[in-house]
C-alpha cells in the first residue's frame, strides 16, 4: 500500500480535517489544527506531504521520525500539530487495513469506559449555574470552567473575590453532587496564582488547569507545594521532550497533552507512559472536533493513568458547527451516565461525512481568539 494524496479542509467552527488516500482505496482521517492558525498548519501539512507521497502508510513510526527529524528546525505548535493530524490519519488507515480499532493495535483495552467532562460558561466565568443545570440533564456530573477573567500581574482584591465567588456559588448550589475543574488559561501570574489557589482551596475543585503559562513551568512545583488541589497542564506542550522536563521538575498531578497538537497518537501514547511512570494522571485536552476526540479516546482506553476526557459538545467556541455535525456514526459517540465507551469500528472509528465537509468548507471562518486589554491598555492573556 502506498500513500497517494493528502487533502485538507478548513471548517467551522475552528477546525481542519485531513484525508490521506492510498492506492488500495483505504483512506484515513486526521485533525491537524492550531486554533487561530489553520492556514499556517495547512501549509505545514502539505510541506510534510512531500515526505509521505509514495510511502507505505503502515510504517507509522518511521514516517513520524522522518517528519520530526528530517527538518533541522523541529517542534513547536505548528509543526507538531501538522504531524499530529497526519499521524491520526495513518493510524486510521492501519486500523482499517487490519480491520481493528486503534486501541486494539495499541495493546487492547485497559478499561471499559472513561469519564467525560463538559465545558460550561464562556471565555469569562458567568452564567455557569444555568449551564451546569442544563448539562446535568444530559448526563454530565463533571465540568470545567474558566477560573477567572483576565487578570493583571498584580491585581485587585475585587478581581480575586469575583473568581472565588463564582466557585462558592457553584458549591452552594450543587454541593458535592458535581465535580469541576478550573482553567486559569494561563491568564494568571505566579504571584496571583499563589493567592488565588489559596482562596479557592476550601471549595475543592477537581483540578486547576494552567495555573501559570507553560513558559513559567518552573512555578508548577512551587505552587503544588502550597496546595492540595491537583494542578494540571499540557495543552501548550508539544512533544515528549517538553513533558519530560515538566515531569522531572514535578508539581503537576495531571498531564493534558492535546492529540491534535502534541504529535498525535504515536507521541501522546509515549507521553501517557511517561506520566504513568511518574505517578501522574492523564486527561487529554480536546476542545476540538470528532477526529481529535476519537484519537483521544483510543489513547485513553489503553492508558492505565487516564482519568477523564474533555469533549467539545456545546462549548462556546462551536459557532457554525457542533461536535458531531460531520459524523455519520453519531451513536458510537453516545455517552452513558457521563462516560464514553470504546469506539469499536476499525481505525479511529469515526465515519466522516465527506460531502458535508466539502460543503461546509466553502464557508469556513478564519477564526481568531479575541485580543483583550487590561484597564491600563496593556494586552491581556486570553
Swiss-Prot record:
InterPro entries: DgoD-like, Enolase-like_C_sf, Enolase-like_N, Enolase_C-like, Galactonate_deHydtase, Mandel_Rmase/mucon_lact_enz_CS, Mandelate_racemase_C, Mandelate_racemase_N_dom. It catalyses: D-galactonate = 2-dehydro-3-deoxy-D-galactonate + H2O. Pathway: Carbohydrate acid metabolism; D-galactonate degradation; D-glyceraldehyde 3-phosphate and pyruvate from D-galactonate: step 1/3. Keywords: Lyase, Magnesium, Metal-binding. The record marks 258 as: Increases basicity of active site His. The active site is at residues 185, 285. Binds 1 Mg(2+) ion per subunit. Reaction proceeds via an anti dehydration. Catalyzes the dehydration of D-galactonate to 2-keto-3-deoxy-D-galactonate. This is D-galactonate dehydratase. It comes from Klebsiella pneumoniae (strain 342). The gene is dgoD.
